[in-house]
Amino acid sequence: MTVVHIFWSLSFGGIETMLINIANAQVEQNAKVHVIIINDLYDDELLRKFNRQVIVHLIHRKCGTKSLSFIFRMNRLLVKIAPDAIHIHMSKFYKLIWSKRLRCMTYVTLHALPRGSVRPNHILYRFFPILGLYDSGNVVFIDEVPGVFAISEAVKEELWREYNINSIVVNNGILTRSFNHRLNKPMGEVMNVVMVSRLEHNKKGQDLLIRAAAVLQGKIHVTFMGDGSSRFFLETLARELNIEKYIRFLGVQSQSYIAEHLCDYDLFVQPSRREGFGLTVAEAMASNLPVLVSAGQGPAEVTCGNCYGWVFENGSVDDLVKQIEYIHSHYDEALSKANRALQYVCETYDVSVTAKKYLKLYQRMN
């Protein structure tokens, strides 16, 4: 089977890491895999992580350009490759595929909770689908794609509830064997807490964790890996609460660094207000690290509620503090739960499981 993945860019991030891992895993399962990167925005280190058997095509579209030449190049490539399945990772790409035959074998994964309009009201969208590229939502044209996948039950349920579109859940996968494991040893006097995510507090909830650290006054040290538009706000908040010495911003770290160093911490916290899945939660579980996540979102789905981690009331600093204090004083229980979570995540969220399910669905739905 020949599979083509189409992606906008390739920079450090959870979705990009997932794309590399799935492409590599599909090759290992004897598929012929091509990856088309449209924008001239990619990281050479990430490109080198593709299996040598994965064929990567760089379109080199300049960011912000109004040129449409990249559409011609992409379609020529697709005709030349003659794939059995085209897997797009943004629904807006669907209308850029000209061949009706190729459109019939196209699938899309919704990588986050749905937002925006499926069918923009402006009449120009009907005649100029290229305008869909500038739509800020993530569901434009998704109702026309033959096969729709959702990364979690939370995403599937909201896509059905808000847009009446059915989808099949295929959980995102991680390379579980690449993560160093935390030893089953007690923590020190101070609990070292880590969060790995873009710094977008309105969605990811980093401000909740900073406020919790202020309440706990020295019981925890918090490290944030990642960068984003909220960094200045979060640094200012830490200063205003007079807890700069308990908060550390490491910035963006490579996937290899994360896989090597998650095990250095005592607790992983994902306090997202709105989150479709929670790939970094699975990574923490693969590191044998106790995890604490917000309720009612994708991360709590990954932990099966309190079965493989702890859950606090979404948006509540008080409950976040309460759960951290409980884990702090019952750390033997936390380590025991982390051991069970490690086995569960390897069986459920390893990328080999994800890749195999995608290949089976391509064949079944074609």
Please state what every model-predicted region is.
Residues 139-181, 192:
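Donor nucleotide-sugar binding/catalytic pocket of nucleotide-sugar-dependent glycosyltransferases
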Residues 5-21, 25-67, 160, 228-230:
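N-terminal strand-loop element at the rim of the active site
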Residues 273:
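Aromatic "clamp/platform" in nucleotide-sugar-dependent glycosyltransferases that forms part
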Residues 88-94, 110:
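Short His-centered aromatic/hydrophobic patch
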Residues 290-293:
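Short hydrophobic beta-strand element within catalytic cores of glycosyltransferases
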Residues 75-76, 127-147:
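Membrane-proximal helix-turn-helix segments that form the acceptor-binding/catalytic region
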Residues 305-306, 310-317, 326-331:
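Conserved acidic donor-binding segment of nucleotide-sugar-dependent glycosyltransferases
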Residues 16-21, 191, 198-215, 229-235:
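A conserved mid-protein helix/loop that constitutes part of the nucleotide-sugar donor-binding site
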